[in-house]
C-alpha cells in the first residue's frame, strides 16, 4: 500500500509542478483606469512595474511614485519595480557612452529604491540603434552591478528579435536596425535578473491588419529567447490591448515643381484600443466577434462608410493560451501591458498572488 501511494505521488509530482502559476507581472501607467485596476486586483498581482521614471542623455532620472499605489503595494507585500525609460536614439547613445552620466543615473536609481522601498528598477530602453548593441549590453551590466551591490535587482524589457537578423524587405530592415537589433539577449541575461520579452506589437499602425501577438510569432520569439536566456529569467509578454485598423484620408504632398500635380498616397492606419473600447465598437457597428484558430487571437471586422475596418484584440481566450504557454515551458512568469486595458474576465482566471512559483 505504501509503495502504491509513493508511486502515485511520484506520478503526480510533474503535473503538480507544471501547474505552478507563473509570476504575474503587470505594468501600470498614470492613467486613472490603470491605477483603479491595480487597486481592484492587487491581490492577483505578483510584481508591479509602474511607468514612473525616465532618464535623459545626461543620466538625470526624473519621476516619483503614486503615494496611494505605493502604500497599497507595501501593505500587500507586492514588490514594486518601476520602469526607467528612454526612447530616443541620440539620447541613448550619449548616455551609453558617458561613464559620468551612467554613474549619475545609477546613484539616483539606488537612492530612489532606498527612499521608497522598491525591489529594483526595470529598464525600458527602446528605439535604440542596432549599432549601439554592445553599448546597451555594457550599460545594463554597469547598472546591474550598481544595483546588485546595494542588494537590489534590475530587469529589462526587450523587443522580441527572432530570428536575430533582418529580413529581405524594407520594413524588415527598418524594424531590425531601429528596434530589434540592439538586444543581445545572451549578454543581457548575464547581467539582468529578469528579461521581460515584449511579445506584442507584431502588427501595429506600421503594418497591415493582424494579431497583436500571433501564436507562431509568439512561439518563434519565445523559443529564440530561450536559446540565450535561462527560463527562470524569462517573462513572456502578454498584451492586454488591441489595434483598430481603418482607412485614413489620403496624404497629399504639394508639388515642388510649378504646374505639377500634387503627390497623393494612401493612408491606412491603426489606433491603439482597449478591450472595453473594442467591445463598444463591435456593439455599435454590429461587428461579429471571431477567433483565429491559427494565430489564437480574437478579432472582428465591420463596415463604416462602405469600407471594412478591422480590430484585433486580447480576450480571455487569447490571454489564457499565452499564460499556459509560459506555464508549460516553466518560464519565470508573464508580463502584461497594461492594467486598465484588459478583458475583465482574466481576473476570474488568475490566482491570487503568493501562489506563483517565485518566492515572495
Model-derived features with residue positions:
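Glycan-recognition patch characteristic of GH18 chitinases/ENGases
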Residues: 19-108
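Conserved, well-ordered alpha-helix/loop/beta-strand core segments that scaffold catalytic motifs
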Residues: 318-336, 341-342
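Glycan-binding loop/region signatures in secreted carbohydrate-active enzymes
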Residues: 240-324, 346, 354-359
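Substrate-binding surface in catalytic domains of secreted glycosidases
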Residues: 58, 129-278
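Short, acidic/polar
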Residues: 28-42, 97-114, 176-188, 313-327
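Conserved, mostly hydrophobic/aromatic
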Residues: 48, 123, 195, 236, ...
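A cross-domain feature marking catalytic cores of carbohydrate-active enzymes
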Residues: 27, 52, 82-86, 125-127, ...
Amino acid at each position: 500500500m505504501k509503495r502504491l501511494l509513493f508511486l502515485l505521488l511520484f506520478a503526480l509530482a510533474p503535473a503538480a509542478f507544471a501547474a505552478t502559476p507563473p509570476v504575474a507581472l503587470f505594468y501600470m501607467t498614470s492613467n486613472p483606469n490603470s491605477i483603479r485596476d491595480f487597486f481592484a486586483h492587487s491581490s492577483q498581482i505578483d510584481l508591479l512595474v509602474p511607468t514612473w521614471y525616465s532618464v535623459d542623455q545626461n543620466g538625470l532620472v526624473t519621476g516619483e511614485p503614486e503615494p496611494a499605489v505605493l502604500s497599497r503595494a507595501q501593505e500587500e507585500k507586492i514588490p514594486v519595480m518601476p520602469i526607467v525609460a528612454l526612447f530616443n536614439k541620440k539620447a541613448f547613445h550619449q548616455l551609453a557612452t558617458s561613464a559620468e552620466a551612467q554613474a549619475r543615473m545609477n546613484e539616483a536609481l539606488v537612492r530612489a529604491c532606498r527612499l521608497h522601498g522598491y525591489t529594483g528598477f526595470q529598464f525600458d530602453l527602446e528605439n535604440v540603434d542596432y549599432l549601439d548593441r554592445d553599448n546597451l549590453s555594457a550599460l545594463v551590466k554597469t547598472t546591474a552591478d550598481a544595483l546588485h551591490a546595494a542588494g537590489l535587482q534590475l530587469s529589462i524589457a526587450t523587443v522580441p528579435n527572432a530570428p536575430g537578423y533582418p529580413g529581405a524587405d524594407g520594413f524588415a530592415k527598418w524594424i531590425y536596425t531601429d528596434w530589434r537589433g540592439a538586444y543581445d539577449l545572451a549578454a543581457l541575461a548575464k547581467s539582468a535578473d529578469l528579461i521581460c520579452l515584449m511579445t506584442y506589437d507584431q502588427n501595429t499602425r506600421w503594418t497591415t491588419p493582424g494579431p497583436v501577438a500571433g501564436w507562431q510569432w509568439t512561439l518563434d520569439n519565445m523559443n529564440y529567447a530561450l536559446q540565450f536566456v535561462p527560463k527562470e529569467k524569462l517573462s513572456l509578454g502578454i498584451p492586454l490591448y488591441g489595434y483598430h485598423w481603418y482607412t485614413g484620408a489620403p496624404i497629399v504632398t504639394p508639388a515642388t515643381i510649378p504646374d505639377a500635380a500634387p503627390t497623393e498616397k494612401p493612408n491606412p492606419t491603426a489606433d491603439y484600443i482597449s478591450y472595453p473600447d473594442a467591445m463598444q465598437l463591435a456593439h455599435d457597428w454590429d461587428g461579429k466577434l471571431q477567433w483565429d484558430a491559427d494565430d489564437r487571437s480574437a478579432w472582428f471586422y465591420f463596415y463604416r462608410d462602405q469600407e471594412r475596418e478591422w480590430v484585433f484584440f486580447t480576450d480571455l481566450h487569447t490571454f489564457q493560451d499565452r499564460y499556459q504557454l509560459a506555464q508549460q515551458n516553466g518560464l519565470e512568469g508573464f508580463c502584461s501591458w497594461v492594467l486598465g486595458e484588459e478583458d475583465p474576465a482574466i481576473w476570474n482566471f488568475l490566482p491570487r498572488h503568493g501562489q506563483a512559483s517565485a518566492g515572495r
